[in-house]
Amino acid sequence: MALGITQFINIAGLLKDLKSFNFSVYGKWFGYINIFLCIALGIANLFHVSAVIAFGIVGIVQGLIILFIEIPFLLKICPLSDRFIEFIKRFETNGYRCIFYTLMAIVQYCSLAVMTTSLLVLGITLTISAVSYGIAFTKHQEFANTNIIKNPTDEDFPHDAVVREML
């Protein structure tokens, strides 16, 4: 039995999220996109022969931090220090996430002072996440998790036996 990515994605949850008009969910979606962009574009900018390398390294670190912020389940399964876990748990509200993403976007916009590179895309997508969380904060919307990724407690979630067969 082959295990596909579609077994972990809840299409009905995607439609439910779109209809909710909860901007914290939209911020979370862009957060997922930012994880990949930060790591990929951070690595891509390591090959410049200028100070942009420092911003590329910062981009990679930002991607890893966003990974733990947007996917809190990883805090339970990865061996991390208590100080790091406390730091990540500070960003469990829309207001703090708005501030966090804004500061990270500003750092990436500062890379433009050295050279215009693809890190500009990081600044833009981080800004979109910040704006989404900011709108959710100003509208007093509850912080919500997305329904796109299936919960391990769902009945149709692939369990250990399926993973063992795949391996």
Swiss-Prot record:
Subcellular location: Golgi apparatus membrane
A Gene Ontology biological process term: vesicle-mediated transport
Residues that carry a glycan: 22
SMART domains: Cg6151-P (SM01077)
This protein's GO CC annotations: Golgi membrane
Keywords in alphabetical order: Glycoprotein, Golgi apparatus, Membrane, Transmembrane, Transmembrane helix
InterPro entries noted in UniProt: TVP18/Ca-channel_flower
Record membrane topology: Multi-pass membrane protein
Superkingdom of source: Eukaryota
Transmembrane segments: 23-43, 49-69, 95-115, 117-137
Disulphide bridges, residue numbers: none
Pfam families the record matches: Cg6151-P (PF10233)
Main location (coarse class): Golgi
Keyword Signal: no
Homology family: Belongs to the TVP18 family.
Functional description taken from the UniProt entry: Golgi membrane protein involved in vesicular trafficking.
Protein name: Golgi apparatus membrane protein TVP18
Organism: Candida glabrata (strain ATCC 2001 / BCRC 20586 / JCM 3761 / NBRC 0622 / NRRL Y-65 / CBS 138)
